[in-house]
Amino acid sequence: MVKVEFAGDVKNLTSYIEKDAKAKIDSVVEEAVKEAEKLLNEKKEELLERAVVDVEKLLSDAQARLSAEKSSIDMEVRRKVEERKKELFQKVVEEAWKRALEEAEKKTERYKKFLEKVLIAMSNEAGEDEVIAYVRADDLEDVRAMVQEKGLKNVVEVKDVKEVGREIKGGVLGKSKSGGVWYNYTLEKAFDELLREVYPKVLEALGF
């Protein structure tokens, strides 16, 4: 009969249990670690994905802002260019008008040719209508001579424009003798028409 050594058996059993328990614990820990790593990797991917999305969103937002700012800057530049155009054009206009007034004031040959030209144009427009030509006091003598010289028979009178309560810088303001029609051939009207005609050319000359 074999004598059972309980002490040894217990010791061996205890050792086995400890090993088995340790193995199970290690297994559980290993599984837990793997699960944790898996979760961590998933979260890491999620975080990375979110980070990429966030970066792309930031870049997209930044691009949108830059685009908006560029559009705003472009609009501001265009606005300033337009303002500059107007300023330069206004200076050209003012200088041209100043010269026109000087020509009229000095009654230069160029102004006299202009006066003759508009007087004939007014007479032609009036046709069979008899008209009274109203001019500046300084131009009365010259215009009366032109009417005779050019044989403008429908221009029946030449008077000072102030008689009808008007003031002009030059040229001729005609009125039908019946009083129903006015013919505007003043220096002011001619200058306005000239501006509309040469405006594009002036802008081109200014580099726009």
UniProtKB/Swiss-Prot annotation:
Family statement: Belongs to the V-ATPase E subunit family.
Domain of life from the UniProt record: Archaea
Keywords: ATP synthesis, Cell membrane, Hydrogen ion transport, Ion transport, Membrane, Transport
UniProt-listed GO biological process terms: proton motive force-driven plasma membrane ATP synthesis
Function recorded in the entry: Component of the A-type ATP synthase that produces ATP from ADP in the presence of a proton gradient across the membrane.
Membrane topology, record value: Peripheral membrane protein
Keyword Iron appears in the UniProt entry: no
Gene source species: Ignicoccus hospitalis (strain KIN4/I / DSM 18386 / JCM 14125)
Subcellular location: Cell membrane
HAMAP family given in the database record: ATP_synth_E_arch
Gene Ontology molecular-function annotations: ATP binding; proton-transporting ATP synthase activity, rotational mechanism; proton-transporting ATPase activity, rotational mechanism
Gene Ontology CC annotation, any one: plasma membrane
InterPro entries: ATPase_E_C (IPR038495), ATPase_V1_Esu (IPR002842)
Subunit structure: Has multiple subunits with at least A(3), B(3), C, D, E, F, H, I and proteolipid K(x).
One Pfam family here: vATP-synt_E
Name of the protein this chain belongs to: A-type ATP synthase subunit E
